[in-house]
């Protein structure tokens, strides 16, 4: 590894460096500081944080695969995908609307799926007991 050492010596040794005054600095020096009677105004910018919109895709996929009562799980999955698409585009209001519909459909699919599962267990038991 080669190290090159360079030393720089000032050209005008013993004399202060000659500075050029910029035009703006010269105007400020001649005119002085501006005197405004009004206080300086400030601008406030509100940046909205990323609003988290749940799209319920996993829940819809579960209902589609396991409890697809009256195709509610599949329809909920379609609305969940639409909600995710709206969220990616930046349309938070549209994403919330589709997510709300997907949530309602998922709730109904879950309730009807549980109800039908219970009926599929109870009805054969009752039929077997009635035959005895």
Swiss-Prot record:
Subunit structure: Interacts with CD81.
Role noted for this protein: IFN-induced antiviral protein which inhibits the entry of viruses to the host cell cytoplasm, permitting endocytosis, but preventing subsequent viral fusion and release of viral contents into the cytosol. Active against multiple viruses, including influenza A virus, SARS coronaviruses (SARS-CoV and SARS-CoV-2), Marburg virus (MARV), Ebola virus (EBOV), Dengue virus (DNV), West Nile virus (WNV), human immunodeficiency virus type 1 (HIV-1), hepatitis C virus (HCV) and vesicular stomatitis virus (VSV).
Record-given protein name: Interferon-induced transmembrane protein 2
Gene behind the chain: IFITM2
Segments crossing the lipid bilayer: 107-127
Location(s) in or outside the cell: Cell membrane; Lysosome membrane; Late endosome membrane
Pfam family, one: CD225
Modified residues annotated as N-acetylmethionine in this record: 1
